[in-house]
Amino acid sequence: MVKLGFVIAEFNRDLTFMMEKLAEEHAAFLGADVSCKVMVPGSFDMPLAIKTLLQKDDIDAVVTIGCVIEGDTEHDEIVVQNAARKIADLSLEFGKPVALGIAGPGMTRMQAEDRIDYGKNAVEAAVKMVKRLKEIQ
């Protein structure tokens, strides 16, 4: 059984809550176990929590769940670009999958509501990567 850790952003919680629930349901459907959940203020705050989970022996992969909505400045782009870069770096550093389930940047609230399946898709990617990496090790 694949053991997942979830790192969930509290910012735009109404949306990340729906993303989280879909992700949990899909994990159960795939036979994966969500062993640990960590809530962080926002997507930019995820890397430290991800690193902590990746250090645990009982976590095979981490799924990120966040939603960054466009504002009047380029803040959303900076947040997502930096978070995504660090997330990829951590995956490579620890040799474990970290799936990007962050919706955004450059999206309106309405678009965000249409993209709540990003968490589900991240679970799918994480589980597939764990299984495929085990095949080649």
Swiss-Prot record:
Residues the record lists as binding 5-amino-6-(D-ribitylamino)uracil: 11, 43-45, 67-69, 100
Oligomer status and interactors: Forms an icosahedral capsid composed of 60 subunits, arranged as a dodecamer of pentamers.
Protein family according to the UniProt entry: Belongs to the DMRL synthase family.
GO BP annotations listed: riboflavin biosynthetic process
Keywords per UniProt: Riboflavin biosynthesis, Transferase
Class of the enzyme per the UniProt entry, highest EC level: transferase
Gene this protein is translated from: ribH
Phylogenetic classification of the source organism: Archaea, Methanobacteriati, Methanobacteriota, Methanomada group, Methanococci
EC number: 2.5.1.78
Any one Gene Ontology molecular-function term assigned to this protein's record: 6,7-dimethyl-8-ribityllumazine synthase activity
Function: Catalyzes the formation of 6,7-dimethyl-8-ribityllumazine by condensation of 5-amino-6-(D-ribitylamino)uracil with 3,4-dihydroxy-2-butanone 4-phosphate. This is the penultimate step in the biosynthesis of riboflavin.
Pathway: Cofactor biosynthesis; riboflavin biosynthesis; riboflavin from 2-hydroxy-3-oxobutyl phosphate and 5-amino-6-(D-ribitylamino)uracil: step 1/2
One Pfam family cited in the UniProt record for this chain: DMRL_synthase
Entry binding sites for (2S)-2-hydroxy-3-oxobutyl phosphate: 72-73, 115
Bridged cysteine pairs (disulfide): none
Domain of life per record: Archaea
Protein's name in the database: 6,7-dimethyl-8-ribityllumazine synthase
InterPro entries in alphabetical order: LS, LS/RS, LS/RS_sf
Active-site residue numbers: 75 (proton donor)
